[in-house]
């Protein structure tokens, strides 16, 4: 694997020798005869150097990892992989982390190759699945690999778009499963953001897949300028100021703009005057009493006026910086911003554009949703904002509405999209400017600052290739803002990629279904998670060797003629540890009886007496050089403790993933999903039972809990509506986190739904205890918060009536319902279910899936 950084421009041919010029000529001739050249010839633009090199490497038979900024043109390499597959009459799969990206790429490829040659697989959508080119989510490909699908037979190229998504806690592990399990005949094309440890990632791919070419480009095709927008007060117009000072050529340099800093100082003074606050008199020590700097008596600093959202949009429109994306880290904030712009009377569209917007919206909505659903989703309000040139874009919207926004923005009809950060993930919506409202966001537990990677992902949308000469990234002045923070975020364009891989129960049985126990452990040792752990373990290994050498030196220094001084120091260390920690540990230990507690303290006291006696009677205590030896002995003891600490860390890293797998196998064996076998030579193997075969077909965050509930007859007394309602707890994730209860249990608290829910909770708690006992992370708790909502929906209720009185958005409901329908369908097809009544339950699950997957949920647009 080699790293190549690229910039435009070729070496000066006049500096080459005749032989070098001839070699260069031959290389050009060979390239002209290549598939890469045939692919590039009809393109309306010249390929960048990094694109050419990546394409050449792919054609030569290498795996390729391309790391480049947003908008640099990474997808050209993916397009060439598909072109190459078509030319060689083999299959290519294009995988994405989210369904919205899959849907977008599917339409792009259909435009090029036609609907007969392109398929789409996203779990709830299947179009032309046996096509030569199939776009899919990564989970679908993972499932195909485990099922050994015949669709994989002619597969030779897999594009992993947004491969840095591998770091995602919930879905990232699937990427590693795919990279590890793909047949070696398949070449991988990975498209990644510019992460700081991309060489490590590429080296790992090479260790698993073979020859891998890493191609890096840090060149942005459209330069990006950084700005800050401020506003003195609500009566004045906002001002857009450069974050960095400009050089003699008018380009932004790397030093902060003094004009910006001075202007912020002026606004600080104005805010202080407005609040009637005077500057602290340092000579009088104001605010520096016993409380120190910022003592309690200090009046809070007056805050500068925060620019109004509508005023920001109005100013950017005046400056010709639209179309733009305004990032606000709150769904409600996005919707409020659009409403504020409308209420302020802003209009960004012409009469001709309004006509086009109405036509496109009517075309996209026609036949998709009922008038009742549209009313529940406040469609008329959504449409009016579009006609004015504004739109929200966030996960709380249904897929159809987001697709309408994306289409209108791409066609230049919607001029300002107000979005949460989810829009920054891959969706092709470049803009002239990007506005970031704050440099911090709420992460579910508290407000945290943006990382350089997150900031780059957001601002990378600014600057449309072939349209704009400059892109603009604008930070809105806000509470606590200082220019240095924005500068730190914008100057660090890369961030590290870390694995989130961990074995799961479903993964374990799928591995053991296709390989023996030891092979499965070796496979897990190939994960990027273990690669990273090994990298840090190697550093610890060096530290361990250094400590061991130091200890050997100390042992020579305190060598004693009277006895074993190392043994003497070990006695003293043990005695010190027990005297300091022994009683404290026993005080916090739980005993069944007072007698047990008393006996434990008696044993501790006896052990202390024994150690004191052994230390006092040790022959080294009579050595005349005892104090000199103790000087070295104390150093030896300190380094011995450090060696133990480092060794523990080393042991926890080496083979850590395989050890998690062992723990999972222990749990599954105890529950009857696996059978353990050991031959005469001590070799261990694991085989799947009937229960294990069921678990193998359940892909869910709650895979084991669901199987245990099925096998325990938890759902036997439910009808289709009740089954859908109870199982919603395994797919619903409340936005505020934590588990919750429904407003009511259909049938009452003593009815079958409430009883089944209680049983399911108990099963989940039991599995949590098992995981904790085996040192594994606890499972996510089931959340019954929308059980009543999903029951009403399965019973035929309208979207409006189901959501009435809840704070759930249409988009959240649809997404949860789609996931529920997927789980129900998995149960329906997991034949034969290995328990009495299994056939009936499978039929019930199929009926429930049909009841859930209707109306707005069944809309073919992916979510």
Which positions does each model-derived feature cover?
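Conserved segment of the helicase C-terminal RecA-like domain
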Residues: 187, 429, 433-443, 448-489
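Conserved Walker B
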Residues: 141, 162-164, 414, 423, ...
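Gly-rich Lys/Arg/Thr-decorated short loops/hinges at beta-loop-alpha junctions or inter-strand turns
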Residues: 32-38, 154-161, 290-295, 381-391, ...
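Conserved interdomain linker/interface between the two RecA-like ATPase lobes of SF2 helicase motors
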Residues: 180, 187-189, 194-340, 391
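Conserved P-loop/Walker A NTP-binding site and adjacent catalytic elements of P-loop NTPases
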Residues: 44-230, 324-328, 335-349, 353
């Amino acid at each position: 694997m080699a790293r190549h950084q690229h910039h435009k421009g070729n070496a000066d041919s006049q500096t080459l020798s005749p032989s070098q010029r001839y070699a260069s000529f031959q290389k050009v001739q060979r390239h002209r005869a290549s598939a890469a050249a045939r692919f590039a010839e009809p393109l309306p633009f010249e390929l960048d150097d990094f694109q050419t090199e990546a394409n050449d490497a792919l054609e030569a038979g290498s795996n390729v990892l391309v790391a480049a900024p947003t908008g640099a043109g990474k997808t050209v390499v993916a397009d060439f992989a598909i072109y190459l597959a078509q030319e060689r009459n083999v299959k290519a799969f294009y995988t994405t982390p989210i369904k919205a990206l899959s849907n977008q790429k599917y339409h792009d490829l259909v435009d090029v190759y036609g609907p007969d040659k392109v398929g789409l697989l996203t779990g709830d959508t299947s179009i032309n699945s046996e096509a030569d080119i199939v776009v899919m989510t990564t989970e679908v490909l993972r499932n195909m690999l485990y099922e050994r699908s015949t669709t994989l037979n002619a597969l030779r190229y897999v594009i992993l778009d947004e491969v840095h998504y591998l770091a995602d806690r919930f879905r990232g592990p699937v990427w590693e499963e795919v990279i590890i399990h793909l047949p070696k005949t398949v070449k991988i094309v990975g498209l990644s953001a510019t992460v700081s440890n991309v060489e490590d990632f590429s080296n790992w791919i090479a260790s698993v897949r073979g020859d891998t070419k890493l191609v890096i480009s840090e060149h942005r095709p459209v330069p990006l300028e950084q700005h800050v927008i401020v506003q003195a007060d609500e009566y004045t117009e906002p001002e857009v100021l450069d974050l960095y000072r400009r050089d003699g050529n008018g380009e932004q340099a790397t030093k902060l703009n003094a004009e910006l800093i001075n202007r912020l100082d002026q606004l600080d003074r104005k805010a202080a005057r407005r609040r009637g606050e005077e500057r602290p008199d340092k000579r009088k020590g104001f605010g520096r009493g016993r409380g120190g700097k910022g003592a309690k008596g200090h009046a809070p600093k007056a805050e500068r006026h925060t620019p109004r959202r509508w005023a920001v949009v109005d100013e950017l429109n005046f400056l010709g910086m639209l179309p733009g994306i305004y990032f606000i880290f709150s769904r409600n904030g996005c919707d409020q911003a659009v409403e504020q712009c409308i209420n302020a009377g802003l209009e960004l569209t012409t009469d001709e554009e309004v006509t086009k917007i109405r036509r496109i919206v009517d075309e996209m909505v026609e036949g998709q949703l009922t008038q009742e659903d549209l009313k529940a989703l406040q469609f008329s309000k959504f449409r009016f904002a579009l006609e004015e040139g504004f739109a929200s874009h966030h996960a709380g919207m249904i897929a159809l509405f987001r697709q309408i926004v994306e289409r209108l923005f791409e066609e230049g009809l919607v001029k300002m999209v107000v979005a949460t950060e989810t829009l920054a993930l891959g969706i092709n919506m470049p803009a002239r400017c990007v506005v970031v409202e704050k440099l911090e966001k709420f992460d579910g537990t508290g407000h945290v600052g943006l990382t350089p990677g997150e900031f780059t992902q957001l601002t990378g949308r600014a600057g449309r290739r072939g349209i704009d000469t400059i892109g603009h990234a604008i930070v809105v002045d806000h509470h606590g803002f200082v220019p240095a923070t924005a500068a730190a975020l914008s100057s660090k364009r890369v961030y590290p990629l870390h694995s989130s891989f961990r074995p799961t129960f479903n993964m374990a049985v799928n591995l053991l279904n296709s390989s023996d126990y030891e092979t499965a452990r070796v496979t897990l040792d190939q994960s990027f998670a273990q690669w990273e752990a090994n990298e840090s373990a190697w550093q610890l290994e060096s530290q361990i060797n250094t400590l061991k050498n130091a200890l050997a030196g100390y042992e020579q220094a305190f060598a004693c003629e009277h006895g074993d001084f190392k043994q003497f120091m070990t006695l003293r260390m043990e005695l010190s540890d027990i005297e300091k920690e022994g009683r404290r540990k026993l005080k916090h230990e739980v005993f069944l009886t007072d007698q047990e507690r008393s006996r434990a303290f008696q044993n501790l006291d006896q052990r202390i007496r024994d150690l004191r006696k052994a230390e006092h009677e040790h022959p080294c205590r009579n050595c005349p050089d005892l104090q000199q030896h103790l000087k070295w002995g104390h150093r030896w003891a300190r380094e011995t403790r450090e060696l133990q600490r480092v060794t523990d860390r080393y042991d926890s890293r080496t083979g850590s993933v395989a050890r998690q797998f062992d723990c999972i196998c222990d749990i599954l064996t105890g529950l009857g999903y696996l059978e353990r076998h050991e031959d005469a030579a001590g070799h261990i193997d694991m085989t799947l039972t009937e229960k294990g075969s069921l678990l193998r077909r359940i892909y869910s965050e709650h895979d084991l809990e669901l199987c245990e509930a099925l096998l325990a007859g938890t759902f036997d007394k439910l009808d289709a509506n009740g089954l859908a309602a109870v199982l919603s707890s395994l797919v619903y994730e409340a936005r505020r986190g934590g588990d919750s209860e429904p407003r009511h249990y259909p049938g009452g608290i003593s009815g079958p739904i409430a009883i089944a829910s209680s049983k399911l909770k108990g099963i989940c708690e039991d599995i949590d205890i098992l995981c904790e006992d085996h040192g594994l992370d606890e499972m996510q708790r089931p959340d019954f918060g929308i059980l009543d909502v999903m029951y009403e929906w399965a019973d035929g209720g309208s979207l409006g009536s189901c959501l009435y009185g809840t704070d759930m958005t249409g988009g959240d409901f649809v997404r949860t319902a789609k996931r529920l329908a997927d789980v129900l369908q998995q149960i329906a097809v997991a034949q034969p279910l290995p328990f009495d009544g299994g056939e009936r339950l499978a039929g019930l699950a199929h009926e429930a899936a049909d009841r859930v997957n209707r109306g707005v949920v069944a809309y073919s647009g992916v979510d």
